[in-house]
Amino acid sequence: DITINELGQLTPDSYILLDMRGDVEVGHGIIPGAIHMSKEEILEKYSGGLVKADEAEAAEREDSAEKKLIIYCARGRISQELAEALRDRGYDAYSLKGGYTSWLLNEMKNQQADEVCAQVEKSIRKKFRKNIWCKFTKAINQYELVKEGDCIAVCISGGKDSMLMAKLFQELKLHNKFPFEVKFVVMDPGYSPENRKVIEENARKLKIPIHIFESDIFESVYHIEKSPCYLCARMRRGYLYNFAKELGCNKIALGHHYDDVIETILMGMLYGAQIQTMMPKLHSTNFEGMELIRPLYLIREDDIKAWRDYNDLRFIQCACKFTDTCTTCNNEENQSKRVEIKQLIAEIKKKNPYVEAHIFKSVENVNIETVIAYKKDGVKHHFLDNYDL
């Protein structure tokens, strides 16, 4: 292993930094200067054989052989095995101790809370006013998400979406056109100490007063072979409803954004044979008097990423037990489908720049008279039911 401090003492031209995490994790942040490659790509590129390579490739491999290869994963566990395999091939290879999380915590130590928070809040009011703040308030008003007397549990997972949502609610409270309360809730379903510290540090830095409660959800789903991520999400929502109710809240706010909505619409059609959407708000079926709201409903994911990067913020993505020991967590069936849908939309957008807006609007323009069948309150209605009336 090589530590973060030891890495910092090396000159940039003396090593090659390789990020072996999944595409989704890398999308949430990468160590500057790192090259993103899968385990298979790394093993293929650094095969150790120069005989069959062309001149350019051979030269690159010879250059690599003279440099340290430093590999990192999420928390420095699975990268150890890969580093060992590369050492067996003759490379001077190391695993970054603690992985990306270790680097992230080290970066956060050097940031001053007052300065960071002030910049973040200013960016919401100024630079991102149009694309983030105005779309947030539009969703609040258009879908009547916040009402007088509400007590809202803003649910923070530790990612970019929920952290932004928390800051937007703090800004909304400053305007406070009518009285309502917010509580910032973090559920620890079994985070590693390092990941919990990342969440706590970000909350401290952004001056978000969080309520943390613990559960054993990660332990409960760890040995589930089929769709553990789906079961985990369902269980987490139930725990959040319950804790929010204990705090006196009547609503929970989740950080789903515009892109989540349009991807859900297409996934339902292409994989579920149904037309449905992710609603901006809904009543809980299991917790009487509770509602779920999605205030980021109109905000684009690229704008959230731009806000994150502009403020040099670093957040966790998935911090479950699976990412400690498994490289395929992000390839879980449902996640891979969502990635596939993202790619499909991006491909269509090359020819039709309005495709995203059209998908979003499609569920607002459903004509019941032109569908074969539909369901209402669990009852299926067919066009033939009233055809001859």
What spans do the regions from the language model cover?
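Rhodanese-like catalytic fold shared by cysteine-dependent sulfurtransferases
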Residues: 1-16, 23-68, 74-122
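A structural preference for short, hydrophobic beta-strand core positions in alpha/beta folds
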Residues: 36, 95, 184, 212-214, ...
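The feature marks non-catalytic terminal segments
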Residues: 313-389
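Catalytic subdomain that performs nucleotidyl-dependent activation
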Residues: 181-182, 259-345
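Short, well-ordered beta-to-alpha junction loops that form the rim of enzyme active sites
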Residues: 21, 74, 254-258, 364
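ATP-dependent adenylation/nucleotidyltransferase module used to activate substrates
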Residues: 112-267, 271-275, 279, 302-303, ...
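Short phosphate-binding/catalytic loops that engage adenosine nucleotides
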Residues: 91-92, 208, 313
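A short acidic, helix-capping loop that chelates divalent metal ions and anchors anionic groups
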Residues: 26-27, 104, 219-225, 326-327
